[in-house]
């Protein structure tokens, strides 16, 4: 019986993470997302005892645009998800996929042992890797 090769989150995550402050306007966050092509932004901690937040395009469409609110007058902290479920770079992507399914996640920050964001992983990243590698 052959041993299955384990693929770690670190192998599929994106390391280009865009971080913003919670006081950033939603309008500015949209501009950043458009320019970078990002679907998610990580919101910085405000102090050591704080947690990271995350802003998704879906937050903007559901909580701002669909509610006919002005993105120029809203701050990211008003609509972001916080705290967010994070994953470790050493995690097997099969468990990451299960975590995403169990908690209905589409993105998660990847956080190292020092508590720093080192990447972001998405359902899309996991699915593409699995497709490319016949998993």
Describe the residue ranges of each PLM region.
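Tandem CBS (Cystathionine beta-synthase) repeat/Bateman regulatory domains
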Residues: 1-135
